[in-house]
């Protein structure tokens, strides 16, 4: 039975390996209910408590200096907020193993429940795309191209902009389950915050500037 509440989720990190000391430095989640985007999102920059390798910063554009200029909190300061936001939801993630691994590692550092213990259901859009389009490219960029989704504002791989794109991709991939247009028409306008371009349907619950 499909869950009423879904969260489109993405993270940015210092590297690839949560079990080898890499840390999360950005979290974003966009809420949907019954396949309709709501006004709610959670977007946080996070201090990783370690260096940010140049090769990682080249991907997401976040350096330690930038994070410190945003007064980014440590994960220990926001982990409970993230857990409460995700609890009981279906999580829509592209390459879910990566983000789930980092979130669970960060939660475990704090003694918090894992995503599974929070009763979250995981849906991996990468696996969905590989099944639906076998032998074809299945990256988020490739899927945006396939579904003619505008990604011109995506300069870096930011967690929030990637969530916004993934929301459109997911609704397009699963269009037979509900109306793609209705998901966007069902929400009103809200003002965008200053640090990241975003569609008007988002009201950020918490974001450190």
Task: List each language-model region with its residue ranges.
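Charged interaction scaffolds used for protein-protein
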Residues: 12, 207-209
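Conserved non-catalytic scaffold segment of RNase H-like nuclease domains
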Residues: 1-119, 130-133, 142-156
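Metal-dependent nuclease catalytic regions and adjoining charged, substrate-binding loops involved
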Residues: 199-205
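Acidic, Mg2+-coordinating catalytic module of metal-dependent nucleases/exonucleases
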Residues: 90-96, 102, 106-107, 139-199
């Amino acid at each position: 039975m499909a869950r009423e509440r879904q969260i489109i989720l993405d993270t940015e990190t210092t590297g690839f390996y949560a079990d080898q000391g890499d840390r999360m430095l950005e979290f974003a989640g966009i809420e949907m209910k019954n396949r309709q985007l709501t006004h709610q999102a959670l977007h946080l920059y996070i201090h990783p408590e370690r260096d940010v390798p140049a090769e990682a910063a080249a991907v997401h554009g976040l350096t330690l200096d930038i994070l410190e200029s945003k007064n980014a909190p440590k994960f220990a300061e926001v982990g409970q907020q993230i857990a409460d936001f995700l609890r009981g939801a279906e999580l829509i993630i592209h390459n879910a193993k990566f983000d789930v691994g980092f979130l669970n590692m960060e939660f475990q550092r704090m003694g918090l429940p894992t995503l599974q213990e929070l009763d979250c259901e995981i849906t991996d859009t990468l696996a969905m795309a590989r099944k639906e389009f076998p032998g074809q490219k299945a990256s988020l960029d490739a899927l945006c191209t396939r579904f003619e989704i505008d990604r011109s504002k995506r300069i870096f791989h930011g967690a929030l902009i990637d969530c916004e794109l993934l929301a459109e991709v997911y609704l397009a991939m699963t269009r037979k389950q509900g109306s793609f247009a209705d998901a966007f028409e069902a929400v009103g306008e809200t003002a965008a915050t200053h640090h990241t371009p975003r569609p008007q349907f988002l009201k950020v619950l918490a974001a450190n500037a």
